[in-house]
Amino acid sequence: MKNLICGDLIYNEKKYKFDFRDNVLVLLPEDLESYPKWQFEHLGKKEKKEYINVEGTTNLGYYICFVHVSFSNMGRGIMQAFVPAYIIGKSNLICPLPKCENIEKIRIYGECLDKFYYPKRIIESNDFFKEGTAKFKVKNIKTDDYIIKNDKFRYGVNWNIPISSNINVVLDVKSYLEVDFKDLKGIDDILEYYLKIKKFFSFINNRKYIEFSKFVASKEIKLNCDINPENIKSKNIDFEFFFVEPDEKIDLSKSINYIHLEDLNNKFSEIYNIVTENSFLTEYYPLSGSDNRYVDNDKFLKVASAFESEFDKAIPNYKSSNNVEYDIVKKTILDYILLEKQKNNNEILLNNDSKKIKSLEKIVKEYSYFEKIIKNIDGTLQEKIIFCLKKYNDIIDSKKQLLIKNYNIEKIKNGILAEAFKNRRNKISHGNPTDSFTDVEVISYELLRICIYCLTLERCNLNIEDIKIIIEKIF
């Protein structure tokens, strides 16, 4: 993005020259306004903040679109905006230039895809100890296809024979994910897919940020290729997306903790749908391997939030469904609150005293408040932690024993782990001072991170054995 891109565009029905470098877009009008005119027009005005997509043409004749920009005035008609993403059309010499609209499919490349969909699958045999056993099936490579909400997600491998001075390089192979849309998509739709797919690969790699090396959208258009008006041919037009990535150390290439598509046991669609929900939390994932080796209060609180969120989705009404007496008491309280609300509402309808009505309305409001609280109470954090540590013991026990050994602890009960986590969470949440992390708090933190994955994968209908394989690979 550090390269300079210049060109022309129209914004608010006005022609501008643009200068784009270092993620900053500057619009220069054909004629600069005088200082007095600009000062009087903008004096005391609060500029409206709106985010738009602005299209133009580069000085090399390519289509360009600056995505989700909000302009501010710099004076004399000059505008400036930060650009979080932009799109370059890969075709010129076409009139008019094709725009990034009515998109039919996207294709994505990246290291996370190479790890997830192993490109060496194009080798039919990997018994390299026997001469002549390595055969390449490059001519009949099959893709793995999945239908998600009527869109076809296709995993495949691209290969080519590179023109390289290195005579030892025979094939260049890259895995890709292609999504064929049932309905044509616009730029904002594509961005939504981009964010969801990144979220899925964050889950797969247990990393907060994931990069793609290439993100291309494409569509097919009809072109008249010569002077004969009937000579119409179809041409595929590509649009490459470029995104501003966070300034964080991303070390996915060094990570050995990842899983393959085959590990999901044909549950890709279910997992994708669940982990790309808006309510699915990924903020607690580590930034890198080094970030994964320490814990702080912020991480601790995010793990607590993610755990409770996943637990409530995986096991709704946990205590009510497992404790008959608790369920009876809860229903009795809710029935009483409902009865009192109805009683007060009826009294409001029959009463003419405005002061009395206001008082009754406040009482009804408080009843509604307590009703909401009682409905949401279904087991404490400590109870939920103990339940998960017991439920997923076969999966987490090896990790638990390793942590106990590392911290020179002979034995520790689930109740002690749960209480330590709960107490630390409460101190942080209520703004109370906290000491350095104890060994027990760190162990409970590490085990709960695994439990979150277990809850999610169980929601995706994976069996315990499949969950165990995935957990061992990620953690």
Show where each model-derived region lies:
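Phosphate-binding glycine-rich loops and adjacent basic patches that engage nucleotide phosphates
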Residues: 148-164, 226-234, 242-249, 261-272, ...
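Short, charged N-terminal helix-start/capping segments
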Residues: 3-4, 8-16, 21-26, 30-35, ...
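Long, contiguous, compositionally biased segments that the model treats as domain-scale units
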Residues: 1-211
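A broad, low-specificity signal marking well-ordered, structured residues that form hydrophobic/aromatic
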Residues: 177-179, 225, 304
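Internal, Lys/Arg-enriched amphipathic helical interaction segments that engage polyanionic partners
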Residues: 188-267
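Amphipathic, oligomerization/interface secondary-structure segments
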Residues: 247-475
